[in-house]
UniProtKB/Swiss-Prot annotation:
Belongs to the CTP synthase family. This is CTP synthase. The gene is pyrG. UTP binds at S14, K188, T189, K190, P191, T192, Q193, K224. Residues 292-545 form the Glutamine amidotransferase type-1 domain.
Length: 547
């Protein structure tokens, strides 16, 4: 079967949940036995989100091949349990970069380079590249909102693709808002009508309309939307607000959403096996206990900055049959005077990754509190580096211990800038210095790690060799390896050549572990990551009330 393409657009306003909708449809089609992939096309001019402020963009999601991508790729991987790659996320910046590179190389033979056909052709090439892996279905999410000027080339490209591929291989789904006005006591369809009108003016007639709403819309409203938007009544579906995002595939299935897609694209009509999803949702709905985890960072005002962390902690809760309540703590506000009060009642503390000095001292105070008060602690990326700094200062007595990132004049730079390493394929040496560009210049992607036996890390993984995803410029300074080991720090994960420290832990603590990589990027609800599973287990076993 030739690959079928499903294009998902959004209207009225942003943040309606196109990524979750795409991931949920993908999960349903995969449950039917189909091979599925998903792509995100982002209209912004940045080449990738790697240098974007988390407060503006949210989390940067890293794939195995080192691509810095939109957080929606995290949804795709978690719902499909399939790895994404660079080809699953393109931006206007990356598309234009390709076009300009070709123009400079002379590929256009002196022709005038224009949005149509050159930019739109490059977008189409990006979409069609998904077919190289022979999926049965490829879902393509168009970022932004219909009507945004920067999204026009992408909409024009997917309009052309229906003509290129044929109607039997393309399907357009439009996600829109149907607000409920409590004062009037009714849903309003006018925003949807105008959104579809805008889409049709571009040349795209949606085949299915998905209505984001607080409560399911009635049959009468579906008839009205179908009439004004020129679709079949049975092609109008509700996307109702849910308490747990993992309910969405089940809600779509109850609506017959995947069945309609299968009929319209003439896909094999095998009934989906949704038992794993039903079990997952039931486990979340009926926990056998609760734990409270504090996430101490500086991006806490935008929860999307820690999206994969949030989900990985939920997965850890599922593995332990407990609900995970999250408390976000701003590390910039933590002082020696208030640290105990700020962290009171937490069953576990997690210090996530980040960049820059702002908020770091609050993280270090947090880690000292967790170490001294035997609170289960998990440090990720910068969180691990801060744990090393805290240990050097307060256990080894190196009062000026710091990271080269924060204080280049420190005499004890226990964390320093990596200047040379193999790429994630181990095929080439990467070299950087302090003057290198910021974008795409970190140690990125999946790298192997050797886990030391008889450690908490090995107890969690159960194997010696693992692969985890990285996103960092700074690394543990091996000059302090022996001194720290003699002071009680255990280096439980190393690169295969032994040169890079990947995991640290304290053996005389209920659970104190830091890792240089980002394990949250490899967790999904059906297979919770081992470190998150064990972290939540420790929080459950050593709750605040028993310490």
């Amino acid at each position: 079967m030739k690959t079928k393409f499903i294009f998902i657009t959004g209207g009225v306003l942003s943040s309606l949940g196109k990524g979750l909708a795409a991931a949920s449809v993908g999960a349903l089609l995969k449950a039917r036995g189909l091979k599925v992939t998903i792509q995100k096309l982002d209209p912004y001019i940045n080449v990738d989100p790697g240098t974007m402020n988390p407060f503006q963009h949210g989390e940067v999601y890293v794939t195995d091949d080192g691509a810095e991508t939109d957080l929606d790729l995290g949804h795709y991987e978690r719902y499909l349990a399939e790895p994404m790659s660079q080809k699953n996320n393109y931006t206007s910046g990356s598309i234009y970069h390709r076009v300009i590179t070709k123009e400079r190389r002379g590929d256009y033979l002196g022709g005038t380079v224009q949005v149509i056909p050159h930019v739109t052709d490059e977008i189409k090439n990006a979409v069609l590249s998904l077919a190289e892996d022979d999926p049965d279905v490829a879902l393509i999410e168009i970022g932004g909102t219909v009507g945004d000027i920067e999204g026009l080339p992408f909409l024009e490209a997917i309009r052309q693709l229906r003509g290129d591929l044929g109607k039997d291989r393309c399907l357009y789904i439009h996600l829109t808002l149907v607000p409920y006005l409590r004062a009037a006591g009714e849903h309003k369809t006018k925003p949807t009508q105008h959104s579809v009108k805008e889409l049709r003016s571009i040349g795209i007639q949606p085949d299915i309309i998905l209505c984001r709403c607080e409560e399911a819309i009635t049959a009468d409203l579906k008839r009205k939307i179908a009439l004004f938007c020129n679709v079949d009544q049975d092609a109008v579906f509700s996307a109702v607000d849910v308490k747990n995002i993992y309910e969405v595939p089940l809600r779509f299935y109850e609506e017959g959403f995947d069945q309609k897609i299968a009929i319209m694209l003439r896909l094999p009509a095998k009934n989906p096996n949704l038992e794993p999803w039903e079990t997952l949702v039931d486990t979340c709905a009926h926990p056998q206990g609760r734990v409270t985890i504090g996430i101490v960072g500086k991006y806490v005002d935008l929860k999307e900055a820690y999206k994969s962390l949030h989900e990985a902690l939920v997965h850890g809760g599922v593995a332990n049959k407990v609900a995970v309540d999250l408390k976000y703590v701003n590390s910039e506000e933590i002082t020696e005077e208030n640290v105990a009060e700020a962290l009171k009642g937490l069953d576990g503390i997690l210090v996530p990754g980040g960049f820059g000095y702002r908020g770091v001292e609050g993280k270090i105070l947090t880690i000292r509190y967790a170490r001294e008060n035997r609170v289960p602690f998990f440090g990720i990326c910068l969180g691990m580096q801060c744990a090393v700094i805290e240990f050097a200062r307060n256990v080894m007595g190196l009062e000026d211990a710091n990271s080269e990132e924060f204080n280049e004049l420190s005499k004890n730079k226990v964390i320093y800038l990596m200047t040379e390493w193999f790429d994630h394929r181990r095929q080439a040496v990467e070299r950087r210095d302090s003057s290198s560009d910021k974008g795409g210049t970190m140690r990125l992607g999946s790298y192997p790690c050797v886990v030391v036996p008889d450690t908490k890390a090995h107890d969690a993984y159960g194997v010696k060799h693992i692969d985890e995803r990285h996103r960092h410029r700074f690394e543990f300074n091996k000059a302090y390896f022996d001194a720290m080991a003699q002071s009680g720090m255990v280096f439980s994960g190393l690169s295969p050549d032994g040169e890079l420290v990947e995991i640290v832990e304290l053996p005389d603590h209920p659970w104190f572990l830091g890792c240089q990589f980002h394990p949250e990027f490899k967790s999904n609800p059906m297979q919770p990551h081992p470190l998150f599973r064990e972290f939540i287990r420790a929080a459950k076993t050593h709750p605040a009330g028993k310490r």
